[in-house]
């Protein structure tokens, strides 16, 4: 019973941020409970990002958000190593995916090279930088938003990436 009450409390909290989208909220919540990733597709301005951030706040998760543009690099997502002259060693600087809930906003506006940086982390829960594999924090969920194909500056996601999303939710206009 306790889990049911906790799930209802999360749903109620998310519904405060985005009203009238109970089916979408339930779909996303079930995917997250199952350990899956979520793709939210719809036109700009219907609350895709607000909904994703509401889940992060309701669940008190460490979140990270990247607004995908053509100039976002794979290293922005997975991190990079920097040589420290003083110690003579490379030091890893974590990327945006080192969190519990990663929000990839408008994922279909970035290069396919950057999109592919998400493949390992979505499938295996790890990132590999300079030959060193590191786990991301658990639990880990990607909620990505995308605008409809054909909108200015968008491109189709590759099938290999679409396969890593458990569900594709649609927001629709606010009620």
Protein language model features and the residues they cover:
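Conserved P-loop/Walker A NTP-binding site and adjacent catalytic elements of P-loop NTPases
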Residues: 53-83, 87-88, 93
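P-loop (Walker A) phosphate-binding loop of NTP-binding proteins
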Residues: 43, 77, 145
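Pre-Walker A (pre-P-loop) alpha-helix and adjacent loop at the N terminus of AAA/AAA+ ATPase modules
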Residues: 2-46
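Walker B catalytic acidic pair
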Residues: 42, 105-106, 117
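Conserved beta-strand position immediately N-terminal to the Walker
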Residues: 38, 102, 140
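Canonical AAA+ ATPase core
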Residues: 84-89, 109-114, 122-175
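Walker A/P-loop
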Residues: 29-70
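Conserved alpha-helical scaffold flanking the Walker A/P-loop in AAA+ ATPase domains
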Residues: 27-30, 83-104
């Amino acid at each position: 019973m306790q889990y049911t009450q906790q799930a209802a409390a999360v749903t109620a909290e998310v519904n405060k941020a985005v009203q009238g989208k109970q089916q979408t909220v339930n779909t996303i919540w079930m995917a997250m409970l199952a350990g899956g990733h979520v793709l939210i597709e719809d036109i700009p301005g219907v609350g895709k990002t607000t909904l994703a951030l509401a889940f992060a706040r309701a669940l008190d998760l460490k979140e990270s958000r990247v607004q995908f543009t053509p100039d976002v690099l794979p290293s922005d997502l997975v991190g990079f190593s920097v040589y420290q002259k003083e110690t003579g060693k490379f030091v890893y600087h974590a990327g945006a995916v080192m969190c519990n809930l990663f929000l990839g906003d408008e994922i279909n506006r970035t290069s396919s090279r950057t999109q592919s940086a998400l493949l390992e982390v979505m499938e295996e829960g790890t990132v590999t930088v300079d030959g060193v594999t590191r786990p991301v924090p658990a639990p880990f969920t990607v909620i990505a938003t995308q605008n409809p194909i054909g909108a200015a500056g968008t491109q189709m996601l590759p099938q290999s990436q679409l396969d890593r999303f458990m569900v594709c939710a649609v927001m629709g206009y606010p009620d």
